[in-house]
A protein has these predicted regions:
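N-terminal secretory signal peptides
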Residues: 21-68
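Residue-identity detector for glutamine
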Residues: 2, 41-42, 73, 99
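Functional cores of ribonucleases/endoribonucleases
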Residues: 51-118
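General helical secondary-structure elements
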Residues: 2, 19-22, 89
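Bacterial N-terminal signal peptides
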Residues: 3-16
Length: 118
């Protein structure tokens, strides 16, 4: 009986780790910096230079409520506005930063993300 229990535990752990890995890989679509819109490239440079940022909400915590990025503790991600030509408001484009120095770009207000490759 203990043998079956051990097998069950091993199988459960294997399935769980596979599911966690799949969840981590959700945002695997990549985009090169050179392929980003010019405004996104400029925002990325501002982020790396620690500002100054043009929008008051730049740098706020991004909650990842839709769980489209890898799951991390609250406060791990921060968001920055990418200017949209012709828009008076903040528009839909953002760069999300992670504490692990990863950067994600969305041009549809958090529906899809591409990880920025430098």
């Amino acid at each position: 009986m203990q043998h079956w229990l051990r097998l069950l535990i091993v199988a459960w752990l294997a399935i769980g780790s596979t599911l966690c890995t799949a969840r981590e890989d959700r945002a695997v679509n990549w985009v090169f910096v050179a392929d980003l819109p010019r405004e996104a490239q400029q925002t990325l440079e501002l982020i790396k230079d620690s500002g100054p940022f043009p929008y008051a909400r730049d740098g706020i915590v991004f909650g990842n409520y839709e769980k489209r990025l890898p799951l991390r503790q609250r406060g791990y991600y921060h968001e920055y506005t990418v200017k949209t030509p012709g828009r008076r408001d903040r528009g839909a484009r953002r760069i999300i930063t992670g504490q692990g120095y990863e950067y994600y770009y969305t041009d549809d207000h958090y529906h899809t993300f591409r990880r920025i490759r430098e």
